[in-house]
Amino acid sequence: MSAAILLAPGDVIKRSSEELKQRQIQINLVDWMESEGGKEDKTEPKEESKAEGSKDGEGTQSESGQKEEGGKETKDADVDRRIHTAVGSGSGTKGSGERANENANRGDGKVGGGGGDADAGVGATGTNGGRWVVLTEEIARAIESKYGTKIDVYRDEVPAQIIEVERSLQKELGISREGVAEQTERLRDLRRKEKNGTHAKAVERGGRKQRKKAHGDAQREGVEEEKTSEEPARIGITIEGVMSQKKLLSMIGGVERKMAPIGARESAVMLVSNSIKDVVRATAYFTAPTGDPHWKEVAREASKKKNILAYTSTGGDVKTEFLHLIDHL
């Protein structure tokens, strides 16, 4: 696509203005506060004009999006149903085995008292090797996407060290309601099992005391050996609630990923605008829930154009999705 002009809601453009300037993209923003008083379109000064030439090797993908004429008026969220392109970029996940292999040598000193290998940790036995795990695939994906650290999902192994992602961190990671509910359900199941396991251990210990009295001192050593050999296998599950990003990173390692902005020469977008005057020359538009009262009319007019690409927010972070779209048009 050459010299693309992208329409978007005014508040989305406002929140992204700094990143747009870094990309040397012009901004034509109609401020709805001022436009109420009859002011005309306000164009923010551009840092550097974008060269208006077509890019080689990339043809315009035209997805015909004309709505049937005769028509019913549509709301913001509906104007682009004819072309619904998911903007967000999900991070693919690998199997838990791969994550386990890659994390085995992390040696951050936070797990099982370990230094290097996972097997070096005190009590770090079983399939999990003593490393921290989470309860859902969604949480594992979110952590990998945000911090670049692969983390296993709990698979009913014992012993286990489980991270419970609490409310403030759930928001930070962008965990969905379904993901939160799934974690809550798994925690309830675990606590129920843990309670039953503790009861079984108490019964077994009582039985050992009776056996010791019955058989006397001669068999005391054998009973003690039995006790010490059986109890490590019954070491239960550690659940650690985590509210802050800092604590999470201290447990799993990694740092927050910050995407470097794509430069002007790498983006096809020349101008972003929320002005109805730019509908005629627009090549694409992005719609999302907005407080811009004029966007409904702009989007409706844009939807009447032939050969215009329509994109909509998938419900995640709107600014991130908007910039991702700009960088990949």
From Swiss-Prot:
Catalytic function, reaction form: ATP + H2O = ADP + phosphate + H(+)
A GO molecular function held by the record: hydrolase activity
Composition-biased stretches (Gly residues): 110-129
Domain of life: Viruses
Binding site for ATP: K110
Gene Ontology CC: one annotated term: viral capsid
Chief location: virion
Keywords assigned by UniProt, alphabetized: ATP-binding, Hydrolase, Nucleotide-binding, Virion
UniProt-annotated location(s): Virion
Subunit structure: Homohexamer.
Function: ATP dependent RNA helicase essential for RNA packaging and viral transcription. Possesses ss- and dsRNA-binding capacity.
Family (UniProt): Belongs to the reoviruses VP6 family.
Stated name of the protein: Helicase VP6-A
